[in-house]
């Protein structure tokens, strides 16, 4: 297991299941801030005493667990790997079904109304902790295909046509 995933697992173990996704979202916000001020990463990573400055800046905006985790990364000189750690943390959340990755494939872009309906279905089935990615795939021929944490729900016409072909071929072999 790579080092960044070990840190991601340690972070998950130090949070409650209820807080785990909120911590992920806060880490994303922190990286957005670091992207605006990239010089801070190098400064913090090589002068860890400067972390108190970061702590005072983020104190009102970021949970202590996130600040503590960032400080550990800084002390271990891994802050420059923050994006990889966050990606590994996302994967750990998905593996533990605390965060749901939903990929929606359709033959054409879904209308806002269809997207809203789909979001309602997703939230009723899996809750509010999800990431959704809409993709256009002309091969679907209509309908939609959902992938949720690797599981596939395929209601596309292409899937139905393939099923009919298999049934006809199976029937012809009898």
Locate predicted features.
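Elongated, mostly alpha-helical coiled-coil "stalk/stator" tethers of large membrane protein machines
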Residues: 1-174
């Amino acid at each position: 297991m790579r080092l960044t995933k070990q840190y991601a697992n340690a972070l998950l173990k130090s949070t409650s299941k209820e807080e785990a996704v909120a911590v992920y979202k806060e880490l994303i916000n922190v990286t957005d801030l670091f992207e605006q001020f990239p010089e801070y990463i190098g400064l913090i990573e090589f002068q860890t005493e400067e972390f108190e400055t970061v702590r005072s800046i983020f104190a009102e905006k970021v949970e202590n667990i996130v600040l503590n985790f960032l400080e550990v990364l800084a002390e271990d000189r891994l802050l420059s790997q923050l994006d990889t750690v966050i990606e590994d943390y996302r994967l750990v959340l998905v593996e533990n079904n605390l965060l749901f990755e939903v990929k929606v494939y359709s033959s054409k872009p879904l209308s806002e109304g269809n997207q809203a309906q789909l979001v309602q279905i997703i939230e009723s089935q899996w809750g509010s902790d999800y990431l959704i990615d809409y993709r256009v795939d002309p091969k679907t021929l209509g309908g939609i295909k959902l992938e949720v944490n690797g599981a596939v729900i395929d209601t596309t016409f292409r899937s139905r046509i393939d099923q009919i072909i298999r049934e006809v071929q199976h029937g012809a072999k009898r």
